[in-house]
């Protein structure tokens, strides 16, 4: 499925301002000010300068929290977003109840204690985010994430993303697959499944094991259209039911 740009000139703007460039600017800015986020339940609150809030928005990290404070802007980050900034980009620190967590392992263990499936979801999130795909929550579409080629203000999301492990019950039967594919197709998205291979149930799911030893397998699943295989169509067309393939574009 080709990118669906939201307005004329959006593609040119995206090419002129790649996400990777904005992320580099954000990384430098947050590191220089030694920005620190505060753990709050299953989110992280980050206080930043107005210019940094604009950079975070350009890079699609977090959501602005409305506040009467004018000097600082408050950004709410998901665990995946916060840990990506903390561990992968090394541009923010994380604190808990006023105490700065000394290393990434402490932060990792806290997030895993709040959300046991965090290792699997972070591995999937960092896999796509490291390839400069923009990820947002896919809750309203019945999936884990939606993936954008660039900022959501410029382009519609191309993929609805489901994260699975080897023992997951999702998409185990054909009816589940067809429902997921039809739902994604109805909102002009391709269903992308990310199979994260590893044992997530053991107590030894530590930081290094997850990030270095676990692997991610990408597959796209699309719906077969019977009208494309009628007798009056070219015999060179090849259709499959359903069409499952590796995501070569990522």
From Swiss-Prot:
<feature type="compositionally biased region" description="Polar residues">
    <location>
        <begin position="234"/>
        <end position="250"/>
    </location>
</feature>
<comment type="function">
    <text>Constitutes one of the two catalytic subunit of the tRNA-splicing endonuclease complex, a complex responsible for identification and cleavage of the splice sites in pre-tRNA. It cleaves pre-tRNA at the 5'- and 3'-splice sites to release the intron. The products are an intron and two tRNA half-molecules bearing 2',3'-cyclic phosphate and 5'-OH termini. There are no conserved sequences at the splice sites, but the intron is invariably located at the same site in the gene, placing the splice sites an invariant distance from the constant structural features of the tRNA body.</text>
</comment>
<keyword id="KW-0507">mRNA processing</keyword>
<dbReference type="GO" id="GO:0006397">
    <property type="term" value="P:mRNA processing"/>
</dbReference>
<keyword id="KW-0456">Lyase</keyword>
<dbReference type="GO" id="GO:0016829">
    <property type="term" value="F:lyase activity"/>
</dbReference>
<dbReference type="InterPro" id="IPR006678">
    <property type="entry name" value="tRNA_intron_Endonuc_N"/>
</dbReference>
<dbReference type="Pfam" id="PF01974">
    <property type="entry name" value="tRNA_int_endo"/>
</dbReference>
<dbReference type="InterPro" id="IPR006677">
    <property type="entry name" value="tRNA_intron_Endonuc_cat-like"/>
</dbReference>
<dbReference type="Pfam" id="PF02778">
    <property type="entry name" value="tRNA_int_endo_N"/>
</dbReference>
<comment type="subunit">
    <text>tRNA splicing endonuclease is a heterotetramer composed of SEN2, SEN15, SEN34/LENG5 and SEN54.</text>
</comment>
<protein>
    <recommendedName>
        <fullName>tRNA-splicing endonuclease subunit Sen2-2</fullName>
        <ecNumber>4.6.1.16</ecNumber>
    </recommendedName>
</protein>
<feature type="region of interest" description="Disordered">
    <location>
        <begin position="225"/>
        <end position="250"/>
    </location>
</feature>
<dbReference type="InterPro" id="IPR006676">
    <property type="entry name" value="tRNA_splic"/>
</dbReference>
<feature type="active site">
    <location>
        <position position="148"/>
    </location>
</feature>
<keyword id="KW-0539">Nucleus</keyword>
<dbReference type="GO" id="GO:0005634">
    <property type="term" value="C:nucleus"/>
</dbReference>
<feature type="active site">
    <location>
        <position position="189"/>
    </location>
</feature>
<keyword id="KW-0819">tRNA processing</keyword>
<dbReference type="InterPro" id="IPR011856">
    <property type="entry name" value="tRNA_endonuc-like_dom_sf"/>
</dbReference>
<dbReference type="InterPro" id="IPR036167">
    <property type="entry name" value="tRNA_intron_Endo_cat-like_sf"/>
</dbReference>
<feature type="active site">
    <location>
        <position position="156"/>
    </location>
</feature>
<comment type="similarity">
    <text>Belongs to the tRNA-intron endonuclease family.</text>
</comment>
<dbReference type="GO" id="GO:0000213">
    <property type="term" value="F:tRNA-intron endonuclease activity"/>
</dbReference>
<dbReference type="GO" id="GO:0006388">
    <property type="term" value="P:tRNA splicing, via endonucleolytic cleavage and ligation"/>
</dbReference>
<dbReference type="GO" id="GO:0003676">
    <property type="term" value="F:nucleic acid binding"/>
</dbReference>
